[in-house]
């Protein structure tokens, strides 16, 4: 019998659009979200593997966990 995994954690993610304000260190960035809130975000693993370059002024998609809305993951560039 195969165990059933709950995919609820993936559905609880919150995705917002933001603009990169500054590069803090390596893969950490300060992002201004569309609702005028500044948060810190780091690159997601797939973006790090693809070695995509993110510069100040770029529009990005930021994913948040419902448990910590101050730290996000950059999952894509627009």
UniProtKB/Swiss-Prot annotation:
S1-like domain location is 4-78
Which cysteine pairs make disulfide bonds?
Answer: none
In alphabetical order, the GO MF annotations are: ribosome binding; rRNA binding; translation initiation factor activity
Any keyword Mitochondrion? Answer: no
Q: Where in the cell is it found?
A: Cytoplasm
Q: What does this protein do?
A: One of the essential components for the initiation of protein synthesis. Stabilizes the binding of IF-2 and IF-3 on the 30S subunit to which N-formylmethionyl-tRNA(fMet) subsequently binds. Helps modulate mRNA selection, yielding the 30S pre-initiation complex (PIC). Upon addition of the 50S ribosomal subunit IF-1, IF-2 and IF-3 are released leaving the mature 70S translation initiation complex.
UniProt-recorded name of the protein? Translation initiation factor IF-1
Q: What is the scientific name of the source organism? A: Mycoplasma pneumoniae (strain ATCC 29342 / M129 / Subtype 1) (Mycoplasmoides pneumoniae)
């Amino acid at each position: 019998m195969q165990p059933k995994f709950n995919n609820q954690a993936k559905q609880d993610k919150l995705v917002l659009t933001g603009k990169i304000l500054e590069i803090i260190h390596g893969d950490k960035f300060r992002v201004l979200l569309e609702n005028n809130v500044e948060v810190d975000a780091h690159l997601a693993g797939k973006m790090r593997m693809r070695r995509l370059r993110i510069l100040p002024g770029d529009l990005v998609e930021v994913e948040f966990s419902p448990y910590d809305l101050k730290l996000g993951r950059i999952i894509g560039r627009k």
